[in-house]
């Protein structure tokens, strides 16, 4: 096999792996429904480019119809190349809206020199995006956070907030008016890096965030990447833990009735067994065969009509 053919095979495996991971996420959390108009938040980074690209490919073959509209918030950061995103979106034929709001000056004016800007910047950005989704009549807001972002958020909340809380794949917005989805929730960041290189997305660096190398999130990210190198499978096990929560073995009295616990009570996950040594699911293993398998970790959910986003559109017969 030639080097070129081998690379093409690897690229094809990567594309299939990402498509299946995103499709599984959408299916597991019922993220997209018939007739949805989805606002894809496009920052110019690798994650949001990949999100839009994969959703477009699913849209072309899915058994249901839904719309996509890309939205970019131009925060008026110095040196931001305003022409890059419109040129790219017009070249691929995706409807889009560029929202111009000078949040950069607001953040710089309000925060002291040297303070991290992410928290305030994020709050300002959310409000503008919620307003834009309403103006466009969108039913869902799609964000580009991936598996590693979700785990990093969990550790940030544990280390600095005293909460066992991560970043949900699907939620209701702060103002209660929108459904926010994260279709990349099952996707590894390292796969997104490879995909961005493969697709040659016109990446736009964030000068505001990128100029703050000592951010807590960056430190946590470095920790996770180090673990991934030194302890293969640890990241996969941690994400699996987010889908296998056992309230009776934690310490939150709001989640489990410890006060009403009685002898002989039949607990769903057992009583005194604190460590389970069962083999972890291999959805996120590094082997390509496992990545494309049918192994699933099903979240508990109410009965509903299941639509497989990975199924093909029904064929129509001619007259």
Curated annotation (Swiss-Prot):
Source species taxonomy: Bacteria, Pseudomonadati, Pseudomonadota, Betaproteobacteria, Neisseriales
Protein residues bound to [4Fe-4S] cluster: 118, 121, 209
Pathway assigned in UniProt: tRNA modification
UniProt KW ATP-binding keyword: yes
Purpose: Catalyzes the ATP-dependent 2-thiolation of cytidine in position 32 of tRNA, to form 2-thiocytidine (s(2)C32). The sulfur atoms are provided by the cysteine/cysteine desulfurase (IscS) system.
Protein name, UniProt field: tRNA-cytidine(32) 2-sulfurtransferase
Species, as recorded: Neisseria gonorrhoeae (strain ATCC 700825 / FA 1090)
Pfam name, any one: ATP_bind_3
UniProt xrefs under CDD domains: TtcA-like
Alphabetical UniProt keywords: 4Fe-4S, ATP-binding, Cytoplasm, Iron, Iron-sulfur, Magnesium, Metal-binding, Nucleotide-binding, RNA-binding, Transferase, tRNA processing, tRNA-binding
InterPro entries: Rossmann-like_a/b/a_fold, TilS/TtcA_N, tRNA_Cyd_32_2_STrfase, tRNA_thiolation_TtcA_Ctu1
Cofactor note (record): Binds 1 [4Fe-4S] cluster per subunit. The cluster is chelated by three Cys residues, the fourth Fe has a free coordination site that may bind a sulfur atom transferred from the persulfide of IscS.
Gene it is expressed from: ttcA
